[in-house]
Amino acid sequence: MKKISLTFLVCFFVQISISQNFKIINNEAIHFNLKQKNDIIDFIVIDTKLDVKKPIFLFCQGSLPLPLFVQPENEKMWMIGGGITNFDYLKIIEKYHLIVISMPYTPVVVGEKNVNESYCYVPDATKPDQFVDEYVKADYLENYEKRAKAVLNFLRKQKWVDNSKLVVAGHSQGSKVATLIAFNNKKVTHLGLFSSNPFGRIDQLIRDYRKSAEKKEITWKEADEKIERKYQMYMDSYDEKKCKSDPNLLAWKSFSRPLINDWVQIEVPTYLAYGTNDIASDLCDIVPLFYIQKGKTNLTYKR
């Protein structure tokens, strides 16, 4: 009897701990946080109830430390949600629990005075280009995958989650995170890629310099000098000592990993959508060629 009572109490307190680990924000989303060894991972479910069992749709946001919500001084709070508001997300939540993970060391809700013109979180409003040091050190691809893995492991154990399907999608930098998640997590059933660069990140800067020279916006000599500087920066990103003195190099190294090598190894249905005037995703036009070479038919694309 004592063993039964003890088991009941443990389950009871565990349930209380989980139920008190979230709150509703702006009557739009439920905020959870997971305490890790050296990090606290905040994420939201874009809904106000969890009474319907649905699969997970994880949306991986783009670059920079954007908060999930902004609180203006004299107006109603509004949701950025990692850019999910650019999509018809209300349609998504009809069939899925839509999840967005906050950027590392970035508050979920930030007052308007602490966001710069690009809506990035800045702790000191007088220094609009200076981000939190911890964020800069945490801003690399493998860390985003690690954080997402922790969130997905937590969600798989929840009674309101249908584990028969797992959709992972990402925009811009988030497409790189989504790719790595799908590449390493066999439970992912569908992958969505929006405004993605199949060859990483740094190559788009080099291509942009060439285009600028072609349009005579800069000289070919200037383009060559700029390209050489990018080569040097990328070389520096592989130098551990230089990365320690300049943590920004970590992001350039990790996010410049060519994605196309991963995409053609991923077996699940993959949806690729991109704009026609986007330097980052210019080379998406040749992605179908790689799938054809491999005899793969799991790619759907939209330009």
Where are these regions (language model features)?
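Accessory cap/linker subdomain of secreted extracellular hydrolases
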Residues: 119-129, 134, 192-265
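Catalytic histidine neighborhood in serine/cysteine hydrolases
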Residues: 293-303
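Short beta-strand/loop motif that positions the catalytic acidic residue
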Residues: 266, 272-274
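Alpha/beta-hydrolase active-site loop
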Residues: 112-158
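Short, surface-exposed "cap/lid" segments of acyl-processing enzymes
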Residues: 50-95, 104-112
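Primarily recognizes the serine-hydrolase "nucleophile elbow" in alpha/beta-hydrolase
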Residues: 151-210
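Conserved alpha/beta-hydrolase "acid-adjacent" motif
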Residues: 279-286
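N-terminal cap/lid segment of alpha/beta-hydrolase-fold proteins
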Residues: 20-55
